[in-house]
A protein has these predicted regions:
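Alpha-helical scaffold segments that mediate packing/assembly in large oligomeric complexes
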Residues: 106, 113-195, 322-325
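Active-site-proximal structural scaffolding
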Residues: 102, 130, 210-213, 295
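Assembly/oligomerization interface modules of large self-assembling protein complexes
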Residues: 28-113
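Residues at beta-strand starts and edge strands
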Residues: 96-98, 131, 206, 296-300
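Sequence/fold signature of self-assembling virion shell proteins
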Residues: 2-56, 165-185, 218-325
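Short, flexible loop/turn elements at secondary-structure junctions
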Residues: 106, 214-216, 306
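Ordered core of a single globular domain
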Residues: 190-228, 234-235
Length: 325
């Protein structure tokens, strides 16, 4: 049993639970675990586990790129002539500065704690209150951050959760070459994904992953399952299709993976995941996961603060498909 739950062990959860108990136990637990909690918050989004991580992003940070071209020289000749051309370039991660503030009336908070303890006593809830309480907050931060990673569009005055930094689709729209942008017509998702696959340069095919929204992935499975000419593919790939919403595109070595951030966007994205960067702080005291009781307001309060941003190292490698009706 956890420290905060230990603190109220033996107290009748209905009659004896007091504000003073929670004022000390829960903030202490969160303070002790603050580093792990802020890390969990910024990496809860699904796509953060797929891409390269850049830490120390407290302001704009450059990703340094090196392009090398080697030309053979004539070894039978005397002399020394440079046959290597190298170009150094940069792409910049421009992070957004995000905070999540929450407050609870002390009576409502105590009622929630008491109800949770009753459920634990009855065996229907196993997690200690503080873990259950915090994990639910982290889960929802992750869900919103996942959408922002793909769909974000920075605004001078943010009004929604997508307004704090430019997401991957905004960057792709601006920087991916026109030749790599494909309009996908019809209603056959299998054919649409194959069209994107066919546009991937041959020298990049082994490292590229095709990302889709979950509804597009389900349509892919439908188009394999209910099409008589493809039903054998669905049978052979059945185990893959039902695990992590990812599968190898039949007849290829290329992974197709569903990510929540592309839901309802009608986009199919082929890219090299290691060339997509997710930037976070991770090193300074600007990152915060704090919980306390405000005596002045007579409220429990919480603050989570962090920076986050994304960038594509090489937009020319990306294939961006847009599904049209």
């Amino acid at each position: 049993m956890s420290k905060a739950t230990d603190a109220i062990k033996g107290i009748n959860p209905i009659d004896g639970l007091t504000k003073a108990t929670l004022k000390e136990a829960l903030p202490n637990w969160i303070e002790t675990n603050a580093s792990e909690l802020i890390t969990a918050s910024v990496f809860e989004a699904m796509s953060t586990k797929l891409f390269s991580i850049q830490t120390g992003v407290t302001s704009e940070v450059a990703i340094n790129l090196l392009d090398t071209a080697v030309k053979f020289g004539d070894g039978a000749e005397c002399g020394f002539n440079n046959t290597v051309d190298q170009v150094i370039s940069q792409r910049t991660i421009k992070p957004g500065y995000i905070k999540v503030n929450a407050e609870w009336c002390d009576k409502e908070f105590l009622d929630t704690f008491a109800h949770h303890l009753v459920k634990m006593a009855a065996g229907s809830e196993e997690l200690p209150f503080e873990q259950w309480f915090v994990e639910d907050i982290i889960k929802h931060i992750g869900e919103e951050l996942e959408k922002a990673i793909w769909q974000g569009e920075k605004k001078a005055t943010p009004a929604t959760n997508l307004d704090y930094f430019d997401g991957l689709l905004k960057i792709m729209d601006a920087d991916v070459p026109a030749a790599n942008k494909i309009t996908l017509t019809g209603n056959d998702t299998f054919e649409q994904i194959w069209t994107v696959y066919s546009a991937i340069p041959s020298n990049l095919i082994n490292d590229t992953v095709i990302y889709v929204g979950r509804e597009t992935y389900r349509n892919l499975i439908k188009d394999m399952t209910f099409n008589q000419s493809r039903i054998a593919l669905a049978y052979n790939y059945n185990e893959q299709m039902n695990k992590e919403m990812e599968m190898i595109l039949p007849g290829t070595n290329t992974m197709v993976k569903a990510v929540n951030g592309l839901d309802d966007t009608k986009k199919i994205v082929a890219c090299i995941p290691s060339h997509i960067f997710y930037g976070v702080d991770g090193v300074s005291d600007k990152e915060t996961f704090k919980f306390w009781f405000s005596d002045d307001a007579d409220q429990f309060r919480m603050k989570v603060a962090f920076s986050a941003g994304v960038q594509i190292a090489r937009p020319e490698e990306v294939v961006l498909g847009t599904i049209t009706e």
